[in-house]
């Protein structure tokens, strides 16, 4: 089963947005992001989290969600990444570092005794251990915890207590991951005529594999653990098998996300392969990623983007079974911006910079709705384009986070 990553899933109608006080003179406005922040006493520590939902017209956080919860590791870990990128662009500040520490305390407290992470907490701050996307297992939220903790570590290095606990937590998590993904038999199988790797998370999940590569890279930078390199290489090889078509044949070097499905959200394969290829001097990773960036991305942008599609094999080629164009969300745009930016850093080719700018322009109105999705005066990013001309103007954590990451990526390219 493939689980959708997002903690949120709202479909509210179109409505105008009310402004709040902006952060002056900066392209990246953290006002709304910070309005979603909550500090609590959690398992004996001062911890912080970011509310999942924030709805039009007030944009006050939604403080009670019965089925799943009010916040999740998936979003808190990404909030750490936002603040780490913000520090890279604008310099370190005490408030950002304090929030990073408290977000980190939240993630550490969400580690289950089995070594993986539960995802949600309820309004009473009890941990949801049973909801399908909150069970402590090898899935998006545990991988996100890895990336969040490794991102926080160097920023908190002056605090020996918390960095020691991060190290212990990550060691336990990676022990689980390497046990459950042994990488000892890299065999493929044919599913509906399409060659698939069988050793990735959830067997075929190249999207989750990309996130794991990013986390393993950060761990390797910190620990020099050779086991990380073995796993990165196996994951990269699996991802490259999931790349289908070529420059002139559909789907134009796109990486399938899971089995025969491509989806926009969290499809960080090119981003991960470029990061790993540059860091580890693996040209095959870089070449594979550039094929998607150069061949698939421009066609997707020209077509007005998509939410997902499914492919089938026709002899040596592929054709499309079905396609959904909407909803379109910041979490579907950000991976492409990240990859195009990484491509530009590697190649110094202006075409990659132009591509990154063109994709990022989705936020400012170059989209099917014909209107901005990010409102600089408020720091709000709308939750998605529902269909041509219709926008869901709620602004939850995920949309806010992913929009800010797009903006920060573009600031780094200046």
Where are the regions that the model predicts?
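Well-ordered alpha-helical segments within folded domains of soluble proteins
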Residues: 70-88, 100, 135-154, 201-220, ...
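C-terminal motif of bacterial Sec signal peptides marking the signal peptidase cleavage site
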Residues: 3-6
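Short linear capping/connector segments at secondary-structure termini
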Residues: 120-130, 188-198, 251-257, 309-319, ...
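Extracytoplasmic/secreted proteins, especially bacterial periplasmic and envelope-associated proteins
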Residues: 78-81, 85, 95, 99-102, ...
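Non-catalytic carbohydrate-binding regions of carbohydrate-active enzymes
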Residues: 26-43, 280-392, 414
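Amphipathic alpha-helical segments of tetratricopeptide repeats
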Residues: 88, 108-109, 154, 221, ...
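Low-complexity, Ser/Thr/Pro/Gly-enriched N-terminal "stalk/linker" regions
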Residues: 9-78, 82, 90-132, 160-199, ...
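Solenoidal tandem-repeat scaffolds enriched in leucines and small polar residues
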Residues: 193-285
């Amino acid at each position: 089963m493939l689980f959708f990553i997002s903690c949120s899933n709202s479909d509210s109608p179109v409505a105008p947005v009310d402004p709040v006080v902006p952060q002056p003179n900066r392209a990246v406005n953290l006002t709304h992001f910070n309005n979603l922040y909550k500090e609590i006493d959690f398992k004996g520590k001062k911890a912080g989290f970011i509310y999942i939902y924030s709805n039009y017209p007030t944009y006050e956080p939604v403080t009670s969600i019965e089925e799943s919860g009010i916040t999740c590791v998936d979003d808190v870990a990404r909030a750490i990444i936002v603040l780490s990128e913000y520090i890279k662009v604008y310099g370190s500040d005490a408030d950002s570092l304090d929030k990073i520490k408290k977000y980190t305390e939240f993630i550490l407290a969400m580690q289950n005794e089995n070594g993986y992470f539960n995802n949600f907490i309820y309004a009473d701050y009890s941990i949801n251990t049973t909801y399908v996307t909150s069970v402590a297992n090898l899935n998006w939220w545990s991988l996100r915890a890895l990336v969040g903790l490794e991102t926080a570590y160097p920023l908190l290095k002056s605090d020996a207590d918390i960095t020691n606990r991060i190290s212990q937590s990550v060691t336990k998590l990676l022990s689980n991951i390497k046990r459950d993904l042994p990488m000892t038999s890299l065999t493929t199988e044919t599913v509906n005529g399409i060659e698939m790797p069988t050793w990735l998370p959830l067997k075929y999940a190249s999207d989750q594999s990309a996130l794991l590569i990013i986390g393993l890279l950060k761990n390797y930078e910190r620990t020099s653990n050779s086991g990380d390199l073995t796993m990165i290489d196996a994951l990269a090889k699996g991802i490259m098998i999931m790349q289908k078509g070529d420059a002139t044949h559909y789907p134009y070097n796109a990486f399938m996300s899971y089995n025969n499905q491509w989806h926009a959200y969290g499809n960080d394969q090119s981003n991960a392969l470029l990061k790993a290829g540059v860091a580890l001097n693996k040209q095959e990773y870089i070449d594979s990623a550039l094929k998607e960036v150069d061949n698939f991305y421009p066609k997707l942008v020209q077509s007005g983007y998509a939410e997902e599609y499914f492919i089938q094999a026709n002899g040596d080629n592929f054709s499309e079974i079905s396609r959904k164009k909407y909803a379109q969300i910041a979490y579907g745009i950000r991976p492409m911006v990240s990859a195009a930016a990484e491509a530009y850093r590697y190649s110094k080719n202006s075409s990659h910079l132009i591509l990154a700018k063109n994709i990022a322009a989705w936020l400012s109105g170059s989209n099917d709705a014909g209107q901005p999705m990010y409102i600089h005066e408020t720091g709000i990013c709308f939750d998605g384009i529902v269909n041509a001309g219709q926008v869901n103007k709620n602004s939850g954590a995920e949309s806010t986070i992913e929009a800010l990451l797009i903006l920060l990526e573009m600031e780094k390219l200046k």
